[in-house]
Amino acid sequence: MALPILLYLLVSVIKSAVVLGVLLTAVAYTVWLERKVVGHMQNRWGPTRVGPFGLLQPAADGIKFLFKEDLTPPHVYKPLFLAAPLIAVIFALTSIAVIPFGNSITIGGYLIPLQITDVNTGLLLILGVTSIGVYGVALAGWSSNNKYSLLGGLRASAQMVSYEISLGLSLVGVLIMSGSFSLRDIVNAQGGHFWGFIPRWNIFHGQFIGFFCYLMAAYAETNRIPFDLPEAETELVAGYHTEYSAMKFAMFFMAEYANMITVACLATLLFFGGWNGPLFGPPILQAVLPVFWFALKIFGFLFLYIWVRGTLPRFRYDQLMAFGWKFLLPLALVNLIATAIAVAW
């Protein structure tokens, strides 16, 4: 049964607050996890001082950012300099609104979807919202009136626009197979098993190449190693956020990790069955188990991000652009054509 309008608004506000709180907490502890894992990979301990196992380190870092001196250099173009981090973080956090986290639940006879808003063009909306984030990066580089920031902003803009094409094409194969832009429909199309034991996830259903293209493009879109050229410290000091400090720098930091989580959510929904798990649990856990599987898959992708950061070197800029245009884009086109032929037959 559909919710009355006032109750719908109340439920939407509650869901928005819960999802935003969980997302910001996940951002904070993804940073903690990265420092811990990379520390162990480099034979260090990582955070250990603040709380048990350093678990309160994110809170300490947040307090530090709040109390740091917020400098605005006199040579910057102030309106855009202040707007750039807001643009980056707002659109990074907004994209989570259409991501479903599990099956709809029934409370008091009302069916409530586990997402802030259920739209039938969810995937298209996410691609549109996340692509706007490049404006924050470009404006940060230009408004800083600094050669290193400008080069970092130019690199980020070119990189994100170039890999956006491969990212979009890598998802068309999934759209052809599911026949819908709705993320919930895409997940439902991946329910069940092949031969009773292999999950019907898209990665096992002819979309391995599409997933590879998506993963490579996602690394470039989020400016992460091995594609973190916009922030290459040895070349550009700190890239487009060289002139930023305190909470304005923290906003760019939050935007980067929020985008990582969004990318992990999309990979889970589109290629790994979303909340459909490889194993079934007892009936008493049917309401909780889908959310558990979804969270576990997201954790796996975030761990992969961190693992790659600790093991791979940075590409040169010419290698980055050549890889995107000469290898990844043709490969995504081949996957699209092969999927279309397979579905037509």
Regions of interest found by a model, annotated:
Residues 1-345:
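Selective transmembrane helix interface/packing segments
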